[in-house]
Amino acid sequence: MFSTPQEKRRHLRVDYKIPVKISSDHGDILTETKNLSCSGAYCRVAQRLDPMTKLKVQLLLPLRKAEKLVTKKIICQAVVVRAQAVDGEVYYDTAIFFSDIASKDSRTINEFVEAMMEKKNYGKFN
């Protein structure tokens, strides 16, 4: 399912800010996602990460379980796909591909994305 006719991604992606910790050989970066899918994330980071840099990613995904809001920590391996300087700023918009993620975690992210898309489409924000 694609968002627009020009969209070529295989998985739904939602614009949503989720806390994320990105770890590489150069240290840890705390940031948040700009958008998310079960196959990757797009983040703004304060340092350039070269394409193909291997990362450990920790996402803090807000989930609703039995009418309670809980946080699910998802840890996976990832690879930088693209890093683009933001004009006039010292940040880089960085695309990350989840290269090694547990199937259940990928499903959890996908269910989250679908739920957020449904809320977005129907205007039901809780």
Task: Name these PLM-found stretches.
Residues 1-36, 44-46, 114-126:
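N-terminal helix initiation/capping motif
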Residues 15, 68-77:
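Short coil-to-beta-strand transition motifs
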Residues 25, 38, 83-88:
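Short, conserved beta-turn/loop elements at beta-strand boundaries and strand-helix junctions
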Residues 35, 47, 80-82, 100:
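A residue-level detector for short acidic-glycine micro-motifs
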Residues 60-64:
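Short, charged beta-turn/beta-strand-edge "cap" motif at the junction between a beta-strand
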Residues 87-126:
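C-terminal output/interaction extensions
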